[in-house]
């Protein structure tokens, strides 16, 4: 589910429509009423305390992840990040806190070191398995 900004041609992911979904892909773009929008952000609390989701893929246009976006996602086993547009200031506080220690995180090769450090600072456990895509 998204909210959109017609003027900028962007959309924000606010959370899954199907609260029981175990696999979620946040797309690079969405089409609303025939208009294509780039999905550039994941809103704060988008998946907060979601106990069902196991796999999340973040699309290539996402440049912002809100505070506590994935907080308390206790079943999240796989996180695939396709975007190279994230910065430390654009990942909100505790965005990944209280996620499993055994989570597998796939990061774009050219951003591996930077993203790994940023994600740990925002709550991904140091024991998570990080790999390059």
Language-model segment annotations:
Residues 1, 13, 125-133:
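Intrinsically disordered, low-complexity repeat and linker tracts
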Residues 1-17:
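Short beta-strand/loop segment at the start of cytosolic alpha/beta domains
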Residues 11, 23-24, 45:
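Short, surface-exposed, low-complexity cationic segments
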Residues 19-41, 51-64, 74-89, 100-114, ...:
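Structural signature of tandem-repeat unit edges
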Residues 43-46, 66-69, 93-95:
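Consensus positions within tandem repeat domains that build extended binding/scaffold surfaces
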Residues 92-95, 113-127:
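Short, aromatic/basic amphipathic alpha-helical patches
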